[in-house]
Each structure stands twice: as structure tokens, then as C-alpha cells.
């Protein structure tokens, strides 16, 4: 068998940069060591056949007591934004979305939308009424359904690994520390003297 990805017979020539970027992504998340061998984190991530950014935040959430919420957010990040903002009705859409916004974090807005939709599904009288309710709130019904489907798939995968969802709501710090493990490349620094664009800047 092959021991290195460079030895794998891909269908067409794979640019060396693509392989290098892949290694960097995994190194950044603690999944491989300097010699590109899998770490314990890497072996755990390999059991979740999803984007390593998403699987890394889910793994951290398991250890930080925020798995239930991070599964919801991770699924949201895996689909197109469920909020509709048509050009001809942007002000109305923004006004409708205010109820879901959280002043502290965009991630918490996802949880607000999720809870709203779960409540709407639980109390719906018909699919048509549910679709109309979503439309009135400038939410895309089909993408909301896709979000639920992805969440169900992610949840099934982690439960099959023997992981357990938290019963106690996590703190702001627990939730966001877990999420940031998968989003390191998007973390910004504020340096008045010499601002850096992101956490991976040289």
C-alpha cells in the first residue's frame, strides 16, 4: 500500500501546492506532526469523513462540553446561508432578521434561527404554512431543510463514535473556543503598529 499521499495514483496530476496546502491545513489543526504523521487528533478526525475544519471544531466541542450546539453551527457552516436577502427587499429582509441576531456573535445567530425553525416545525399545521412562515421571515425553506439534514448526518456520525451531547448549555467561551479550533485561518489580530491579516500570516 501507499504510505504517503504523494504516492497515491490520482486520476490526474495533482499540483504539489494542493498537497502542501492539505498538510498545512491538518498541521494547523494539530492533526499531523512535523513529519506529517497523524496525531491522536488526526486519527479522531479521520473517523469523521467531513471537512477537517468542521470535524476539528466538532472534536473540540466534544472535549469542551459544547457538542450539541457546535453540531448545529457546523451544519450551518456546511450549507448555503439560510437567510434570504433579495436585492429588491433588502431592508425588509434585514428588519426580519433582526430577531435572530445576537450582538455578541454571528454563531449565536445560527442557534437562534435553528431554535426558531425547530419550534416552527413542531407547531406547524401544514407544510405550506411552514413555507409561508419562512418566506415571511426571509428564510429559505429548502436550505433550512438541508441544514437539518446535514445536522442529522453529523449527529449520527458522532453518536456512532460513542460521543455524547452535552445536556448543560455551554458558556460563551466554551462554545467559541471549540469553533475557533476549526477556523484558525480566519482569526484576525488587532495590532495598532502592524496589523496582520489573519492568524496564518507570516
Residue spans for each PLM region:
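Second RecA-like catalytic domain
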Residues: 1-202
